[in-house]
Amino acid sequence: MVVSEEGKWPEEERWERYTSDKISRLLNTFPGVQNIKTNWSQSMQDMFVLTMHYGKRNGTYLEIGADQPRIINNTYLLESEFDWTGVSLEFDSDKVEFFNSVRKNKCICHDATTFDYVNLFEERNYPKQIDYLSLDIEPPEQTLKALSRMPHDVRFSVITFETDLYDTLRRNDGKSQVQSKSEEILLSYGYQRVVKNVASQGQPYEDWWIDPTVIDPHIVQKFVLSLCSYGHINYPYSNDMKIEGARCIIR
């Protein structure tokens, strides 16, 4: 792989990745993890998804805000190593063209806040229970709009939602309206937040959710207890809580 082809390779200190030599440091394992050489998400979202699904193969996803096809992408590992299928959305046409030259699962160039998701799911015969929803566009208010457009009769087993809380804190605006509104929406649909304020370089920017009606509660409990046992988080959540994404996966 030519790094310069994407121009997005972060400095090593800004991107802690899982690599196969860290397998003994995993807080939780799953079938197939021994075959993973490295992950690709910014904060190990891909590893979180696989942990919650216990290494599920042939899963389904919807990715809102694809950006790059591999570097800091939440679905490349799922597609390339676990045979997941899905579709990504991206507003930048140049990024979409490059994405589609690299990936098997394709990316659509469209505004995620006006896109017809009902038609997409019908055309592609998506199941009513989709395994993963990744929501990450700029600014976070747009991410919230995209969430609001999701069909009510379709559920997602795992959701990663970018709040960009650090930006709110930087502006001293107090509580993030995007975070509180997304909480309101997802809680009203019966979703459960597993990790609040996932951070990168100390900057909290994302919340991780699951559908408790389909994700094994024993997996969730084990995941949460492993975080608590290493002092990474405390329950109940405090308003100033944050946790580096990598600490959710490796000790």
List the predicted regions and their residue ranges.
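SAM cofactor-binding core of SAM-dependent methyltransferases
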Residues: 33-118
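Short amphipathic alpha-helices and their capping/turn segments at secondary-structure boundaries
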Residues: 50-51, 122, 146-151
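Short secondary-structure transition/capping segments
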Residues: 98-101, 120, 206-213
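Internal catalytic-core helix/loop-beta-alpha segment
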Residues: 107-137, 141-142
